[in-house]
Amino acid sequence: MIKYNCSISERGVSWGLVGESVKENDTVENLDRLFKAAKGGGYEVFISPHYLYPADQAWGFGGAAERMMLEGKEFFRPDPLSLEGLDSSGADWLDRYRPYIEDGKTVVVSPHKVWGPQTNDLVLQLRKRRIGRVILSGMLANLCVESHLRELIEQGFEVAVVKDATAGPRHPDLGDGYEAAVVNYNFIANAVLTTEEVVAAML
């Protein structure tokens, strides 16, 4: 789903919160394995990007993680109509994923704004392709991934979450986002799988 420098790179502004979880899950490598298997097996791949623009800095309220995101300028792009400054920024893809995402076949939908796909066209793009089953991965486990899971389930999709192809923040006051997410995945998703299980099923 989403694999940005901000949230998955050691250079990213979120690394202090997510780094341990990313390394423990081997998230970067597992996402690469999923991309490779999906592309090799002819599966359609969708990216639900998370972008924030200067106008979004004027928001008057938000939750704790939302405020951290805005204050840290995570996923920030200076202009919604220009790609200037995007390359290698926190809002850019990890370089190792670029060949998969920019192959002319991956569907990059319009950006979501907070956590879920209610504000973008992911559901429309899936329905227009008569896709009813989704394998979900990406960042962050308890925020965007869980929010996408909940909305896709509500919209009638069957959703499997790849639990080691995601990671979550660990905050001294707010808690362990990854552990919280996995509990909810087990309650909500149609399946909770490992990368190894998904890759084996795709071959």
Question: Each PLM stretch: what is its role?
Answer:
Residues 27, 48, 166:
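Ser/Thr-centric signal marking residues that sit
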Residues 47-56, 62-63:
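Catalytic-core segment of enzymes that process non-peptidic bonds
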